Each structure stands twice: as C-alpha cells, then as structure tokens.
Amino acid sequence: MTWEGAVAVMIGAAAVILALAAFGWWRRTRRDAALDAPVGEAPEGAVDVAEFRALYVATTVRDQPLERLAMRGLGFRSRADVTVTDAGIALDLTGKPRIFLGTSRIDAVDQATVAIDRVVEKDGLVRISWRLDDGTAVDSYLRPQDTSARSLADSIAGILTPHQTGTDA
C-alpha cells in the first residue's frame, strides 16, 4: 500500500468514527429530549449557607455513573458556582441559566470516585441524588475546586433532613 493509500484509509476510518460518535450523541439527545433541569431561582427569603467553586461533571441515571443524560442545561461538563441555601442548592453553570434543586427534590448527598469519564482520588466527587419533575431519579456529580469534596457534601447534608443524607454523608 502506498503512503497516500494509507493516509486515505486513516482519514476514512476517522470519518466513520466521528460519524458514529455524532450519531450516538444525536440518539442520546433524542432519548433525553423530555428531560429538563429545574431552572429557577431560590425561593425569596432563602438564606445562603455556603458558596463553592466546582467543576460540574455530569448528570446520570441514578446509580449508573457511566450513563450520561443529555438533558438541556446539564448535558455538558462546565465550571460551576454552587450556592447552598437553607432551601436547596443553586447551580450556576457557565453560560446556562441558574438551576435550583430544592431540598424536597434532593434524596441524598455523598461522595464518589467515578462518573462518566472522570476518575479521581477516592471520594473526590460529590454526588447529589435528586429527582426531576417527572420523578426520574438522577445523580449529579461535582468536583470542588477550592475545597474538599467532604466539605461540600457536609454543607449540603446540613440542609437536608436526616433521612436525605445518604449512606456516608
């Protein structure tokens, strides 16, 4: 095979791989088209408890950390400002409207090590288990930037009732 032929085969293989990846993402966005992140502000009178800078990693199907959901507002990794209030958690992702998870929506908070393509040191991620408007159970993963994952998890656990804090939070 000539050098030009080898290059043509490599370009063709790369094009097929990119086409398959695009097709897979298109199918995933169609599957998750009905899922929406809860966009909105904290209720009036909510008191800020703590603020954190974090990397938003992903939202997945509950207890399936490798099954990303492609929902509007939470489909892509992003920098995030996390504001913990006495009424819930506000997520401000770069370029997206504010997402507010009220305490009644949050089922648990704990720490994790892996989500999608992110593997970190033991318990380096914060996993927030919550429910969408339609009742779908999901997990969202955050990687704190200026503090420990335990500090963020403890701050969130502090606003939840005891049965909401997860197994190790």
PLM-predicted stretches and their roles:
Residues 1-41:
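N-terminal signal-anchor transmembrane alpha helix of single-pass membrane proteins
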Residues 27, 109-169:
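Acidic, Ser/Thr- and proline-rich intrinsically disordered linker/docking segments
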Residues 56, 81, 88-90, 100-101, ...:
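Ordered hydrophobic segments in well-structured contexts
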